[in-house]
């Protein structure tokens, strides 16, 4: 009888490769596996995958989790409300992750396609969830294509940098520093008129002030 692997494909592939390489080594000839009931349906399979990799001992990377959310939403027609119930994530988180995944797949990775580029997924999540950046995008003051190039060119050191990107884009001189040099250079330019741009203390003071007003 033949069995279909519904989870653990990478592990099964590795065992198959090693079995061909080490023909006389019996430990690569078999692999421990759970055999599921023959009549198990798609929803049960999807739940097993989520339980294993979103909450289990072998979690997927943030990028892989987003890809699964995208698959369930687009290919399996799972609503955001249903995904909320299954994942315990907020609908806004799910939507931002799916959109960030689409941004990378459709615009970023075709141009910057090294395997290591996927670790920059958090940059795109931050881009999508930032309300000030959304306003700038809607006004046509920044495009996803521009953002992709800035990420691909190494303008940012970490995903957290994106949280301050709107400050830079709202200042013409700082924006030019970003384009010509780096995000760090843009912050140094911006710091001359806005101390909160680089200072965590001033940043917290500014946040408190916004909360009061």
Q: Residues of each region from the PLM?
A:
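A sequence-level detector for short glycine-anchored, His/Arg-bearing signature motifs
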Residues: 1-24
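Glycine-rich loops and low-complexity Gly/Arg-rich segments
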Residues: 18, 57-61, 119-121
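Basic, glycine-/proline-tolerant helical and adjacent loop/strand elements
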Residues: 110
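Amphipathic, charge-rich alpha-helical segments that serve as recognition/docking helices
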Residues: 25-106
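Accessory, typically intrinsically disordered or conformationally flexible segments
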Residues: 1, 23-29, 86, 113-213
């Amino acid at each position: 009888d033949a069995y279909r692997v519904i989870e653990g494909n990478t592990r099964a592939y590795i065992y198959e490769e090693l079995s061909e390489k080490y023909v006389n080594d019996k430990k690569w000839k078999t692999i421990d596996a759970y055999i599921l009931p023959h009549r198990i349906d798609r929803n049960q399979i999807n739940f097993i995958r989520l339980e294993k990799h979103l909450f289990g001992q072998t979690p997927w990377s943030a990028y892989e989790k987003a890809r699964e959310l995208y698959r369930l939403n687009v290919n399996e027609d799972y609503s955001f409300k249903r995904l909320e119930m299954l994942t315990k994530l907020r609908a806004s988180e799910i939507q931002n992750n799916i959109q960030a995944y689409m941004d990378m797949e459709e615009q970023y990775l075709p141009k910057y396609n090294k395997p290591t580029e996927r670790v920059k997924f958090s940059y795109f999540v931050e881009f999508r969830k930032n309300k000030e950046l959304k306003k700038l995008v809607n006004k046509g003051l920044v495009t996803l294509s521009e953002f992709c190039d800035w990420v691909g060119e190494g303008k940012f050191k970490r995903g957290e940098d994106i949280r301050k990107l709107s400050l830079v884009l709202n200042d013409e001189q700082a924006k030019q520093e970003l384009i010509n040099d780096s995000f760090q250079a843009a912050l140094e330019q911006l710091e001359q008129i806005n101390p909160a741009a680089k200072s965590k203390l001033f940043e917290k003071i500014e946040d408190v002030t916004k909360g009061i007003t």
